[in-house]
C-alpha cells in the first residue's frame, strides 16, 4: 500500500512539473510579439498557433504620402 501511494505521489509531482514546464515554454516562445516581430514598423503583434504574427504598420500613412 505504501509503495503504491508513493508511486502515485511521484507521478502527480512529475505530471505537475511537466505541465508547468509546458506552460512556461509556450509563454517564452510567444511572449513579447510586439517587441520581437515589429521592432519599428508595426502597431502590434499576436501569438497565433505558437508564432508571432504582425499587423497594422504604423508608418503606412507616411509611405503613402511619399508615394503621392
Curated annotation (Swiss-Prot):
The keyword Signal belongs to this UniProt entry's keyword annotation: yes
Alphabetized InterPro entries for the sequence: Scorpion_toxin-like_sf (IPR036574)
Disulfide bond annotation, renumbered to this chain: 30-38, 33-54, 37-47, 42-52
Subcellular location: Secreted
Expressed in which tissues: Expressed by the venom gland.
SUPFAM superfamilies registered for this protein in UniProt: Scorpion toxin-like
Primary location recorded for the protein, binned into one broad class: secreted
Propeptide section residues: 56-68
GO cellular component: extracellular region
Signal peptide: 1-26
Keyword Secreted applies: yes
GO terms for MF: potassium channel regulator activity; toxin activity
Record keywords: Disulfide bond, Ion channel impairing toxin, Knottin, Neurotoxin, Potassium channel impairing toxin, Secreted, Signal, Toxin, Voltage-gated potassium channel impairing toxin
Family label: Belongs to the short scorpion toxin superfamily. Potassium channel inhibitor family. Epsilon-KTx 01 subfamily.
Function per UniProt: Probable weak potassium channel blocker.
Comment block on domains: The presence of a 'disulfide through disulfide knot' structurally defines this protein as a knottin. Is completely devoid of the classical secondary structure elements (alpha-helix and/or beta-strand).
Protein name: Peptide TsPep3
Lineage: Eukaryota, Metazoa, Ecdysozoa, Arthropoda, Chelicerata
Amino acid at each position: 500500500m505504501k509503495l503504491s501511494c508513493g508511486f502515485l505521489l511521484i507521478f502527480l509531482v512529475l505530471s505537475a512539473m511537466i505541465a508547468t514546464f509546458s506552460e512556461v515554454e509556450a509563454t517564452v516562445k510567444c511572449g513579447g510579439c510586439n517587441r520581437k516581430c515589429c521592432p519599428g514598423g508595426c502597431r502590434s503583434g499576436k501569438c497565433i498557433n505558437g508564432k508571432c504574427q504582425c499587423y497594422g504598420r504604423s508608418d503606412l500613412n507616411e509611405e503613402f504620402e511619399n508615394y503621392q
